[in-house]
């Protein structure tokens, strides 16, 4: 073969320029890599920048900030900024912010905040029950199978969806932040969630072993009730016990004092928020071949309130999604928005922009997948 040799034992093709690597990383291969790296002085400059400043800082694109202005043609009145701190409650904060918009408007307030700790308590409680019920539904599945492994991977993570918050609100309502303020564990959930995750995995183990030993479903549900009592106790210790009733006391923009006593969470929502949650649906843009547009989708074993509505998404082309969001804001209502906020974002500048960083140019590589491919892979 002209210009090439074949070593059949190592399955290596060697050519005049470069080579096709076999299944091993050999010293010869490393030498080739090092020579290629050192031959381009741009690599040395990039290495100096990234090792000193970090990849994102070194690849930040200043033009992205210059071209992104925080001035908008549609601007809705909003209260003071809320802070989820060291927790994964972004979806919950965003939904409660849409609800408090109605409270601020209806009571003529400068600002107002709903208790995120209250909804966190019941979200963790309901997710625990949802998890244990899922374990009871899958007792015949192999322990090492993909389904059980999936269920055990994160029994009650902080994350959630719009429909999950709606399920909580329909059942428990909402309360002012003063009625159930933040705690250390609500603002930094990692330690509490780790303890609950460990306990729920143990509970799953006990339920599956009891089933293997011949326990009936009724007997397993009695065990589950005792397990849920323990979960409730842990949540009370970490987050405090939710109020059954509370008093609303606020002062409006005109310095008028407002008091409403002996309210429940559901009564407060009906009276001061007043939204019909059945009128809302989550819109997504998932341009994958297995999800045709203008259809709704759900994910099995994704939820919190077992008897609640399933998590649903209506898949739309991105332009239709944008039109719907703009129309809702023009109508005077905020839009709940969820995304993979860790991608292409800069907290310092408040940017969510695919041009925020130029890591591909800095590293000399390409990121060529389209959105559908990124969702699939």
Predicted regions located by residue number:
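Active-site-adjacent substructure of cysteine-protease-like catalytic cores
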Residues: 86, 151-155, 189-193, 198-203, ...
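Internal, well-ordered alpha/beta segment that forms a basic, Gly-enriched binding/recognition surface
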Residues: 119-239
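Long, well-ordered hydrophobic secondary-structure segments characteristic of membrane-embedded
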Residues: 57-146, 151-159, 166
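Aromatic-residue-lined binding/catalytic grooves and analogous aromatic/hydrophobic interfacial grooves
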Residues: 193-303
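Short, Lys/Arg-enriched N-terminal segments with co-localized hydrophobic residues
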Residues: 2-20
């Amino acid at each position: 073969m002209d210009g090439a040799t074949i070593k059949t034992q190592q399955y290596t093709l060697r050519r005049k320029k470069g080579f096709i690597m076999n299944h091993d990383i050999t010293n010869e291969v490393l030498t080739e890599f090092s020579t290629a790296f050192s031959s381009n002085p741009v690599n040395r400059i990039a290495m100096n920048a990234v090792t000193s400043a970090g990849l994102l800082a070194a690849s930040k694109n200043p033009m992205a900030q210059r071209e992104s202005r925080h001035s908008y043609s549609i601007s809705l009145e909003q209260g003071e900024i809320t802070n989820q701190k060291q927790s994964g409650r972004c979806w919950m904060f965003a939904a409660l912010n849409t609800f408090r918009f109605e409270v601020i408007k209806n009571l003529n307030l400068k600002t107002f905040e709903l208790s995120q700790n209250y909804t966190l308590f019941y979200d963790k409680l309901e997710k625990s029950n949802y998890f244990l019920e899922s374990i009871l539904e899958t007792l015949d599945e192999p322990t090492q199978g993909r389904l059980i492994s999936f269920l055990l991977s994160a029994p009650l993570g902080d994350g959630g969806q719009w429909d999950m918050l709606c399920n909580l609100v329909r059942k428990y309502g909402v309360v002012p932040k003063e009625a159930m303020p933040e705690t250390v564990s609500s603002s930094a959930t990692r330690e509490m969630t780790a303890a609950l995750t460990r306990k729920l995995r143990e509970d799953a183990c006990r339920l599956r072993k009891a089933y293997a030993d011949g326990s009936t479903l009724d007997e397993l549900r009695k065990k589950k009730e005792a397990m849920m009592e323990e979960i409730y106790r842990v949540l009370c210790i970490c987050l405090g016990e939710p109020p059954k009733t509370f008093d609303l006391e606020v002062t409006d923009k005109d310095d008028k004092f407002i008091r409403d006593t002996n309210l429940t969470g559901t009564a407060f929502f009906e009276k001061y928020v007043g939204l019909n949650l059945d009128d809302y649906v989550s819109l997504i843009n998932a341009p994958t071949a297995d999800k045709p547009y203008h259809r709704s989708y759900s994910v099995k074993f994704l939820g919190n309130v077992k008897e609640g509505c399933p998590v649903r998404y209506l898949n739309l082309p991105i332009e239709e999604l944008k039109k719907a969001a703009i129309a809702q804001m023009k109508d005077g209502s905020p839009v709940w928005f969820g995304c993979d906020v860790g991608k292409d974002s800069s907290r310092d500048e408040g940017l969510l922009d695919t041009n925020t960083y130029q890591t591909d140019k800095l590293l000399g590589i390409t990121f060529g997948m389209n959105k559908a491919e990124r969702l699939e892979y």
